[in-house]
Amino acid sequence: MEDFVRQCFNPMIVELAEKAMKEYGEDPKIETNKFAAICTHLEACFMYSDFHFIDERGESTIVESGDPNALLKHRFEIIEGRDRTMAWTVVNSICNTTGVEKPKFLPDLYDYKENRFIEIGVTRREVHIYYLEKANKIKSEKTHIHIFSFTGEEMATKADYTLDEESRARIKTRLFTIRQEMASRGLWDSFVSPREAKRQLKKDLKSQEPCVGLPTKVSHRTSPALKTLEPMWMDSNRTAALRASFLKCQKK
């Protein structure tokens, strides 16, 4: 699974996931399913914000190619992917500027158009079950929840899906692609089932053979949303754009 993650996700997403796990004392080489889940969640958050801007009239607009007009403002502030100190600094700044209620838990995004924090969920289970778990944890009507599954299902607070259908379809297609790629390599069952994951881990620890059948190339294209995480360690030039193929795994 670790090899799959490193070769099928953008290197910057992988690095952010590694930093997040190490911040909590977790090892990506051991907790490989969690490593994959974090990378998937990060990519979903970045794709959620990609191409979406607010014009000078305060209207939402989509710009998919080239540099956006200087008058346009990014619609979403990305909180997920930052270290906790920086993330809370961003949240506090937003709350002080907009007057919105400070959330109890760190959200994933802030929507400047709807003036609300957003919690993104990606689940391997039923969307309604995961939605209820998120809602019970957050316990705040101020934070908007949007759940995606690997089967193309989604669920959002008050059935308000925030994004246009095409933007959401990009995310759903990417998640379905990840599922297919995992399944083709015999990784999906262990990703879904903790019991199977433990069995696979024991098997992997016993084997010293290198993984075979994995893709040999990795996409180095950068999601525009990743660029907004500067000045952490990325440059501020938002030029690369995820297209319809957005970071598909390369097959041999």
Curated annotation (Swiss-Prot):
One of its GO terms (molecular function) is RNA binding. The record marks 195, 198-199 as: Important for efficient shutoff activity and nuclear localization. It comes from the Viruses. It comes from Influenza A virus (strain A/Turkey/Ireland/1378/1983 H5N8). Its main location: host cell. This is Protein PA-X. The keyword Iron-sulfur does not apply. The active site is at residues 80, 108. Keywords: Decay of host mRNAs by virus, Eukaryotic host gene expression shutoff by virus, Host cytoplasm, Host gene expression shutoff by virus, Host mRNA suppression by virus, Host nucleus, Host-virus interaction.
